[in-house]
């Protein structure tokens, strides 16, 4: 794993503790990415066995969040980190919360697939698979950016969510047209819309992780900035990089 050039501490154990927590976060991220990938596959292929495995695996994601959270609390209490060390710990705490919620989405997709969908709904699921693959790639990329605290990559991924939003809007229009043409499909279309919205929200979760990377690197909290203000800040960051 790439070293972040963390502050050198008198206690080498402190560095080891921080690196260990980062490693755990990336392990959790890898598990969540696999859970999401499997959930999309299970939904598209109507694979009940795979869907069941994803549902059962959600408890492991939850346990990892609790374990990492407790480790962060111990570091804060024991080491009283400051500056970039404190920002790293806080970014980790917030990131694992987002990862756990993405894991919940994978769980919900599988439960919905088991309870609501059948092979006759396959045409409705094709576009959802495409959206799902897009968000899986976003998650993969943001985990890589988090591993390196790569601000440039985080900015690129942040902007990628606009493409996810447009894809989601297209799916909504398609599903609404399908429903208006055949009222018998209303229940299944509404379920597909619920799944599409849940998948689209993964892009928002990835955006949040990008904001935590920005916070660690720049020391600035951008979570509640308006879209225009944040875009100006990102453009300014791009301009500094180009100089």
From Swiss-Prot:
Disulfide bond entries: none
Domain of life from the UniProt record: Bacteria
InterPro entries to which the protein is assigned, alphabetical: P_transport_PhoU, PhoU-like_sf, PhoU_dom
BP term (GO), one: intracellular phosphate ion homeostasis
GO CC term (a single one): cytoplasm
Stored Pfam families: PhoU (PF01895)
UniProt GO MF annotations: protein homodimerization activity
Keywords on record: Cytoplasm, Phosphate transport, Transport
Keyword Aminoacyl-tRNA synthetase listed: no
Compartments reported by the entry: Cytoplasm
Known partners and oligomeric status: Homodimer.
Role according to the record: Part of the phosphate (Pho) regulon, which plays a key role in phosphate homeostasis. Encoded together with proteins of the phosphate-specific transport (Pst) system in the polycistronic pstSCAB-phoU operon. PhoU is essential for the repression of the Pho regulon at high phosphate conditions. In this role, it may bind, possibly as a chaperone, to PhoR, PhoB or a PhoR-PhoB complex to promote dephosphorylation of phospho-PhoB, or inhibit formation of the PhoR-PhoB transitory complex.
Record family assignment: Belongs to the PhoU family.
Record's protein name: Phosphate-specific transport system accessory protein PhoU
